[in-house]
Amino acid sequence: QKKKYEKMVYEYSRSASSAISEFAPNNSFYVDGRKLTIDQVDLTTAQAARWRLCPNCSHAQIEEMGKNTSACPQCGSSAWADAGQVRTMLKVQMVYSNMDYTKSLINDESDDRNNVFYCKQLLVDVDEDHDISSAYRMDNEEFPFGYEFVRKATLREINFGESDMTGEKLSVSGVEEVRKGFRICKYCGKIQPQNGKANHSFACKTRKIPALMQAD
């Protein structure tokens, strides 16, 4: 008789500022004497959308079909229109770590906390035409300093994937970096390796219809 598996569910939470790295795909976090690695995104709560990101300023907006994209509405950059400035992004609410309980346990010999590093960026988007109430600068050419008072600003912190030195670069808000993103199955939310065998949940429809993987 085969031994039956017992499924145990534990829930942990982090602030958004911590979770964007600690609960990011392929990263591991340590709790209750265990090392848990994130391997799946909950797609029932995540919001997917295509965003256009300005290479020159911090402006970003959801891509809309038929909308004029010839120049950034904030800074006027013509590079805003480049197709490469559009990325599909997920607003993640919940992730999973599916692991064997015994394998997740750590001891003194295995407690090497090697965390994954990510390419992250905080975008501070301000409508300069309507939300800057006043601005000041030093009247001294040798000491260039100024500041602005703004009524409101939109802050977006984006995780663009694991840090890497090689690959195609993308400029966002004046910063050019390799931004590989994450490969996630759109049917089951399992994190896919950059190279190697695909990884899917037992209930993923790609297991019954493998052609779905080729279609993507």
Question: What is each of the regions a protein language model found here?
Answer:
Residues 1-216:
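Extended Lys/Arg-rich polyanion-binding regions
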